[in-house]
Amino acid sequence: MNTYLYASPPCILNNIERILKMLISLKDHLVKTTAIGLLLGSASLATPVKAESSLEGNIGFTNNYVWRGMTQTDDQAAISGGLDFSAGGFYAGTWASNVDFADDTNSEQDVYFGFAGDAGDVSYDVGYIAYMYSGGDDLDFSEIYISVGAAGFSLTYSYLVDADYDADSGDETYLALDYELPLSGDFGVSLHYGIYDKDSETDEQTDFGMTISKDDFSLTFSQVDDEFFANDEDMKIFVSYGIGF
């Protein structure tokens, strides 16, 4: 697992170069492997089948990595990178970023897979995601999720299926409602409201926010009402930039 730490401009440049080299190398390798597999498979079939698939990489920068309203980098910058493969509605991918928790945890890597598609005017997505952390103990966890969307709205339900940090945490859920405003031009505006529930009368966290985007840039305002940790978080305002390849 790679660790990307935010420290100084030279360190950031080194991390960017390392992430780009890693993702480009992995992408090239997977493309070659997939092409060879398709050639061998078509040679063994009487009727060749055309496989529609894609492999894409991404790298992102933000002055604050915020997840469900909570900073994951102690209000510091983050560099992230990911790789996604999709074919016929099925998809799988991985994503990594630096983090900064109270212990020695300093990096996060996610692995996910699922199936997404459309049924008329309704979109849907069902999948599984595992969150893994290096440098700390008992923080890994995984969720299953289902999402439906229509007319600019999307509703996503996530359910915790496994967690190293709490043996009794199986009832944790997160419900998110998002809305993409129908704007013309290059700008986009989306609204978000989420509820994090630990299946008790007190352990509930809500977060809400707004994101303004243009091209590869986005500006997000995020506020959380946090009962998990019995404190009130200040509004988070952060800028993000992402590129794909």
Feature map (PLM): residue ranges:
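Outer-membrane beta-barrel proteins
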Residues: N2-F245
